[in-house]
Design a protein with these regions (language model features):
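Polybasic/polar functional segments that serve as interface/processing modules
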Residues: 1-117
Length: 117
């Protein structure tokens, strides 16, 4: 069964992915490009070039699930960096699906001071 438990690890395949790919094509990207096990219980999310569709792949122990969301208007705030995998929480994935960004503009950036006065 599809696992939507709060502790589920979600990986975002940053950049654009050809969403015409199905189970085997997406699993191959996970295995060959990102060197991860597509048969883990993790969720792997992919976005198209126009950022109007997201496809999520998850193995449940007996088969793959594919979930897909396509927007009628607007676009997802998907990370740009190609060839990178970003680990997010399930809650953050819900934010993406609701149109929010993980890096909202105007938020303070974390700093790491090197000198203590």
């Amino acid at each position: 069964m599809l696992d939507l438990a709060g502790g589920t690890t979600v990986y975002l395949a940053c950049g654009a992915t050809d969403l015409r790919k199905s189970y085997h094509g997406l699993a191959a990207i996970i295995k060959l490009k990102f060197k991860l096990d597509p048969y883990s219980r993790c969720m792997f999310a992919f976005c198209n070039r126009r950022r109007t569709s997201i496809k999520i792949l998850q193995w449940d122990g007996s088969g793959f699930w594919i979930l897909m969301k396509r927007l009628d208007r607007d676009s997802f705030h998907w990370p740009d960096t190609p060839d990178e995998l970003q680990k997010v929480t399930l809650k953050e994935m819900h934010w993406f699906c609701d149109g929010l960004s993980l890096t909202p503009k105007g938020a303070f950036e974390e700093c790491h001071p090197k000198i203590v006065v």
